[in-house]
Amino acid sequence: MEQFQEKVNELFAKHETLLSRKNIPLEDGNGIFTRYQHPVLTAAHTPIFWRYDLNEKTNPYLMERIGMNATMNSGAIKWNDKYILMVRVEGSDRKSFFAVAESPNGVDNFRFWDYPVTCLLYTSDAADEL
């Protein structure tokens, strides 16, 4: 139990280090765009609880259950004084879903919302109620 919890704490600590890492502008640029040292969002930014079953009884070896392969094709807006990305997240199985990540400055500290984007499916009966 104790060793499992230590591993979970280590996962969260490493993840927090990644999320809170300062993204430094690179010196060599063309004067039009500013390039940065790190990508603003990667598969490693996805929440730990999306990737791991954190229950020791059902995942005693703390194996990653849902592998993330990439984050891509983001659309960005500034909303409520935050920078919001609608991101296509690709799993290791190459199946994709959409998720929202936000940052206070648009350069670093991007954090995914707790849940991916879901769509409500309307049947003709449900549409009649609208």
Residue ranges and their predicted role:
Residues 37-40, 111-118:
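Beta-propeller fold detector
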Residues 46-47, 90-93:
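Short, solvent-exposed loop/turn segments at secondary-structure junctions
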Residues 48-49, 64, 107, 116-117, ...:
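Short coil/turn motifs at helix boundaries and re-entrant loops, enriched in small/polar
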